[in-house]
Every structure is written in C-alpha cells, then in structure tokens.
Amino acid sequence: MTENQKVYDITIIGGGPTGLFTAFYGGMRQASVKIIESLPQLGGQLSALYPEKYIYDVAGFPKVRAQELVDNLKEQMKKFDPTVCLEEAVDTLEKQADGIFKLVTNKQTHYSKSVIITAGNGAFQPRRLELEGTAKYEKKNLHYFVDDMNKFAGRRVVVFGGGDSAVDWTMMLEPIADKVTIAHRRDKFRAHEHSVESLMNSRAEVSTPYVPVELIGDDTIEQVVLQHVKTEEKIIIDVDDVIVNYGFVSSLGPIKNWGLDIQKNSILVNSKMETNIPGIYAAGDICTYEGKVKLIACGFGEAPTAVNNAKAYFDPNAKLQPMHSSSMF
C-alpha cells in the first residue's frame, strides 16, 4: 500500500438501494465511505431493469417510481459525499495481517477497515447483442444502460427487447425522441399488460416479430437491418441510437471465493449483519438468516444494523447505539 492510498472506514460493495442507504448511514456515523459498483450507474436493478415501475412497499411512500426512489437515495447520501467507483467489479477480498481489508477490482486496489456487501443478487451484466462487430459501437451509440434520457432528445432510437425494461424505456423515450421503434422477436410482448396497451396506443413504432441481423455504420451505428422471423423479409431503419434490453445475467461470481459462509447463493449473517469473517458485513438481498425476507424495505432496516456494528468493530470506543437523526442536523 502506498502512502496516497486512503484506507476507508467502510467500503460498500454494491450500489443498489440498500447500498445507497448504507452509504448515507455510514456518513451519519461520521465514517469515511466508499461505494464500489460494477454497473455504469448507481441504483442496481431498480435503475437497470424497471426504472418506471412503481414500488408500493417502501415505508412512507404510498407508491414511488423505482428511479425516483434511487434519485432520492442518491440525493440523501450526497450530504456526506461518499466516494463512488463505477464499472468496477471486486475480484478478490482478503483481510491482511494488519486487519485492513484489501479489495482488488478490475481497475484498481482499495483498502478499508470494514466491508459491507450489498450486492443484491450478485454482480449482473447485460445480455449483449450477438452480432459481428457490435463491440466497436459500445459507449458510442449502442447502449445497454440509460443514465440520462435527455441525451436522446430529438434523436431516432431503436429499442431491442420484449420485456418490461424494453417497453418501459420505449415509453420513456416516446415523448422526447424524434422517433422510437421497438423490435421484438415474438408477436407478443412479455411486459405487463397495461404497459403493452400504453405502448400500442403511443406513437412508437412496433416491429414484431423481427430480429436484428446487421448494424451498419463506420464509427457509429447509422442503420439497423431487421429480419422478419417467419418470412425472412428484411427492413432497414435509419437510427441515431440503439438500446438493447435483453435482460441481465447475475451471479455471485468471485464472492464465492472470499471465504464467506454461503447458503443457497446468499451470504449467511448473524443478528449484527456480520458474516463469518469479523469486519465483513452484508445487508439486503445478498444476505440470509433465519426468517430472512428479501424486500427493499428489509434492506433499509439491515443497513443501519450493519453500519453501527461495523463502526463498533473498527472503532471500539464508538457507541453501538447512535443518536437520533432529528437531533443531529
């Protein structure tokens, strides 16, 4: 470890809703906090899979859009300005002889006094478009994630996919894009009936059953070639952007190699949210214990327990029971 590599009090693996609230609460306990997230954006599955869906079982909200909840959590944690590392997947996690945890990602090495794993169902990556030469368009105008809808304003967009995410993104783009087309390989969409009805009544163009067979363009995609699944008829669409929503593949991945007790693809914790390795905690859907319920609301309750016990771990003089937030600001 070099002198300029800061040792954080708490490093959080996973930037979904539980991870974001964990970061806020870590700030409440005056801890230095870092979040490491494998995706290009915070919010986990809420942002990546169903940003426009309503959530009804979060305390205090009769209903709240998934992305709105994420935005509120991000705004909440900004009060303490945690360090955020995006597009980083943790490969190895080990406890050194001095008690400091060393986390090696695909980009760099991090050091921390404690670790809280809030990785949901594990690291997940998008199912990519399996066409020759697609890689050169990524991070240009071939998108697997959408972090800013406004960049599609006035542009011609094609969405590939037939599930909730594909239909949601199409409906979000419909009022701001110049033209939006959704192409699905089946006649019927797998999305919620109400969403499909809204899609059919919108100005979005629907191409079914079609599959993409070619992307045309030198530096960026300029045209998409779609082929009818049954007749093999081909059509060419002029585009400015392509969004692929073929779903995601998730797995615990390297987490299984960190020496943690794993039960049915979840990390076993005790009532302190502590794993079998002192100093490593877990919260949210990634963890399990007797009576565990996998809900966002439960993750929000587990986060303070993990943080307070982590604080007591790396600072034995700290009180486990914190002050009430109403008396702190």
Swiss-Prot record:
Reaction catalysed by this chain? Answer: 2 reduced [2Fe-2S]-[ferredoxin] + NADP(+) + H(+) = 2 oxidized [2Fe-2S]-[ferredoxin] + NADPH
Q: InterPro entries under this entry?
A: FAD/NAD-bd_sf (IPR036188), FAD/NAD-binding_dom (IPR023753), Fd--NADP_Rdtase_type_2 (IPR022890), Ferredoxin-NADP_redctase_2 (IPR050097)
Q: Which E.C. number(s) belong to this protein?
A: 1.18.1.2
Pfam families assigned: Pyr_redox_2
Which residues does the record give as FAD binding sites?
A: T18, E37, Q45, Y50, V90, F124, D285, S326
Keyword line: FAD, Flavoprotein, NADP, Oxidoreductase
Q: How many and how are cofactors bound here?
A: Binds 1 FAD per subunit.
One MF term in the entry's GO annotations: NADP binding
Q: Give the protein's cofactors.
A: FAD
Q: Quaternary structure?
A: Homodimer.
Q: PANTHER family annotated for this entry?
A: THIOREDOXIN REDUCTASE 1-RELATED-RELATED
Q: Which family does it belong to?
A: Belongs to the ferredoxin--NADP reductase type 2 family.
**Under which name does UniProt file this protein?**
Ferredoxin--NADP reductase 2
